């Protein structure tokens, strides 16, 4: 049954659903067939030929989803106390931009460092099929180590262990698969259980850092040392570029792989080194990890590097991304209402994530406004159309005669000001500690200036 069925006929089935959910949670016994799940294979590429080119999505029973969602909502409330501050995925009051700012600030430090006998490096890890490889015994034990009660552990493991799968082939379920490992994409509880699994890796790295065996990187003398950052399955590790620390990091990863079932994808793992490191050292560390060496800032959490020399390239990439979408719309007959929705929901929404982290060049904002303006007035290729109203007028509210389109420059500054406000209002966060130590150690955050050798992240926040 679809969710719409339960919503429409809740007056008739609501009490039965509530009783089923409560009985399952109280007895800790899953009714037979309630956790039967269909797997829908979504192609990752245009013409898939291998099974690895499909993304499996679990289609769970609706009543099971209610049970799982109840547990997920309860778990969500205590994640802030359980998950370490280096991990920001799915944790209330933490955002993906926290990791972005700290990572780019730390990479800026690596890129600008000129002194010191030993260099620094960043290791960007890529784990393959993280959900599918989680060992149930590890999940149960890490949950117990984090202090959860046995009743809670039995409830979560009930959800994990009672599942069975059938694969949808041409819309029909085929076969019956009984798994022994893994979590399922589509289960509301899975992202939070994976956070608990990843906390094991974070704890091992923290233990090495506290013991002084992995030094980590500090953006300045007063700032805390950052040994690693986690966002779901995305992990970045910072340490000295020596074989000694490299071996210790590799030892932690090997132990984590053996315990949790995770597998490091060495082909997609990358290393970024401090400039003055010798080629010999780079090759030794590269051989240890079996990873590739990158020469500039790596893309992190979907954001390209915004360094001075690469800013034009990034601007061109964003413009092309929006431009390709608009070109696809121009060949279709779209009403003015449809054009309005496409501009607001797609063309002007596409760069929002990047605008939340970086100040985009004004020329790029003007180019994006130009693309949206031309699409609004129906301009195709080189055939110019008359713009009967200025773009500035269209960006005003509808009550004032405009269309409510965004002024991208003002929107960019507003998003960055919001990030500055978050840093100011969360004095106990890791993000605040890093920026406070580097840019406003002797003054309040509101009085902070650019300072010496600021990163582009800080320049963007100050500009707002």
Which residues fall in each region the model found?
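Short, intrinsically disordered, charge-balanced linker/junction segments flanking boundaries
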Residues: 458-464
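Nucleotidyl polymerases of mobile genetic elements and RNA viruses
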Residues: 1-446, 452, 456
């Amino acid at each position: 049954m679809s969710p719409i069925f339960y919503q429409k006929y809740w007056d008739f089935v609501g009490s039965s659903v509530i009783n089923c959910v409560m009985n399952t949670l109280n007895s800790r016994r899953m009714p037979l067939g309630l956790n039967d799940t269909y797997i829908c294979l979504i192609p990752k590429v245009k013409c898939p030929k291998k099974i690895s080119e499909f993304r499996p999505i679990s289609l769970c029973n609706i009543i099971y989803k209610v049970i799982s969602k109840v547990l997920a909502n309860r778990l969500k409330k205590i994640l802030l106390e359980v998950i370490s501050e280096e991990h920001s995925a799915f944790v209330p009051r933490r955002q993906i931009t926290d990791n972005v700012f700290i990572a780019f600030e730390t990479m800026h430090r690596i890129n600008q460092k000129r002194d010191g006998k030993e260099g620094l490096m960043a290791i960007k890890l890529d784990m393959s099929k993280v959900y599918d490889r989680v060992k149930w015994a590890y999940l149960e034990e890490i949950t117990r180590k984090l202090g959860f009660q046995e009743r809670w552990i039995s409830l979560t493991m009930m959800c994990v262990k009672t599942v069975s799968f059938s694969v949808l082939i041409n819309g029909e379920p085929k076969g019956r698969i009984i798994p022994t490992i893994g979590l399922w994409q589509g289960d509301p509880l899975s992202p939070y259980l994976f956070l608990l699994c990843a906390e094991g890796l974070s704890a091992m790295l923290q233990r090495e850092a506290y013991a002084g065996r992995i030094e980590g990187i500090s953006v300045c003398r007063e700032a805390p040392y950052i040994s690693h950052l986690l966002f779901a399955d995305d992990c970045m590790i910072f340490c000295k570029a020596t074989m000694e620390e490299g071996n210790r990091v590799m030892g932690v990863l090997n132990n984590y792989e053996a315990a949790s079932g995770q597998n490091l994808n060495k082909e997609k793992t990358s290393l970024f080194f401090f400039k003055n490191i010798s080629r010999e050292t780079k090759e030794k560390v590269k051989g240890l990890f079996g990873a590739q060496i990158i020469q500039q800032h790596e893309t992190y959490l979907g954001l390209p590097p915004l360094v001075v020399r690469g800013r034009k390239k990034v601007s061109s990439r964003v413009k092309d991304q929006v431009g390709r979408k608009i070109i696809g719309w121009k060949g279709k007959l779209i009403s003015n209402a449809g054009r309005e929705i496409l501009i607001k929901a797609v063309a002007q929404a596409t760069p929002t994530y990047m605008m939340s982290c970086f100040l985009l060049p004004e020329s790029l904002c003007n180019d994006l406004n130009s693309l949206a303006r031309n699409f609004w007035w129906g301009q195709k290729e080189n055939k110019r159309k008359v713009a009967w109203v200025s773009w500035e007028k269209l960006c005003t509210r509808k009550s004032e005669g405009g269309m409510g389109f965004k002024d991208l420059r003002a929107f960019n500054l507003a998003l960055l000001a919001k990030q500055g406000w978050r840093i100011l209002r969360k004095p106990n966060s890791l993000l605040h500690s890093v920026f406070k130590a580097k840019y406003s150690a002797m003054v309040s955050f509101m009085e902070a200036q650019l300072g010496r050798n600021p990163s582009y992240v800080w320049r963007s926040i100050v500009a707002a």
